[in-house]
Amino acid sequence: KDDVLLTVDDLPAGSTVRLAVMDRFDGNVWNLSDSTMASDSSNYHRVGDSIANNAAGKRFTAKFTVDDGLSDYWLPMAGAASSVKFATSSDADSFYYNTDTMSAIYPSRTSPGLSYTETGVIPRTPTDKEIAKANASSISQPKAEDVPDCVDKLATAIAGGQSKGGEAAQALADKLRESGWFSHGLNGD
């Protein structure tokens, strides 16, 4: 618990760092879907000097330095990146970014001393009232497989009477959090 894996300078207070994105759960194991399952969540592309994104929020520029103990294919990031500059230019050749999930992969694997500067936006977190008023969006997700019938029945029982998609999502999140099945991984979850 006390090992330093990553040092980040100049990130706005309260910002989170995304270490990985797992969007597929088979009931036992979280995993990353491939491009045949969900086009939105598996679109990693090499990027040049800038990354197009439409995120609104607090702009930042932060320096990341990988310390001992972090050797992974995921490149830690914060918010929605608009550019990533590596201390060593050849390191940029192994950088891939997904604008839909605001996440990055680094096939050469991170290693101690890897240093990069991310410029981007920490998206504004909507209020509970704004979420409740929101309609559901349509996104491409992996097909849920082997889901017991009781899951659909429980979801309908919890959220079926809500008039907006946001209200339904909040009702589901609240009930699952109360039962210990849901967390954003943040303090207080």
List the predicted regions and their residue ranges.
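Acidic low-complexity segments
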Residues: 88-189
